[in-house]
Amino acid sequence: MGVGKPRGIRAGRKLARHRKDQRWADNDFNKRLLGSRWRNPFMGASHAKGLVTEKIGIESKQPNSAVRKCVRVLLRKNSKKIAAFVPMDGCLNFLAENDEVLVAGLGRQGHAVGDIPGVRFKVVCVKGISLLALFKGKKEKR
């Protein structure tokens, strides 16, 4: 039979200590107290601006077979280099080296998504113009 939690008139300290220890099993609590949010490339922000340093193709994981179009971005705020996915068919053509891009997170909190290994971010804007607007032909790149 399980022991369970202590009961009794003088069990308060033991209960408080146990609760304090058990909080560390919660991932959100862990991240909050250890300050992991500030150690990621965005430093707690939802978006970040950066410069495109090169275009890269990243091979997708098994069982898929494709080359996912990505760019290497040098973030302006902290000079970290990241890989960012370029969504939609043909949008890589709107990007050139040294273009300023706005990058956002991609999918699950701090994890790569789908079959693209090691890519945690996506390109949202190029030179202040939405990538979606460029793709649909509503705006032109300056």
UniProtKB/Swiss-Prot annotation:
Please give the CDD domains that the UniProt record associates with this protein: Ribosomal_S23 (cd03367)
The keyword Ribosomal protein appears for this protein: yes
InterPro entries in the cross-refs: NA-bd_OB-fold, Ribosomal_uS12, Ribosomal_uS12_euk/arc
Q: What are the recorded GO MF terms, alphabetically?
A: structural constituent of ribosome
Q: Does the keyword Ribonucleoprotein apply?
A: yes
Per the UniProt entry, what is one GO biological process? translation
Which family would the database say this protein is a member of? Belongs to the universal ribosomal protein uS12 family.
Name the UniProt record assigns to this protein:
Small ribosomal subunit protein uS12
Lineage in the entry?
Answer: Eukaryota, Sar, Alveolata, Ciliophora, Intramacronucleata
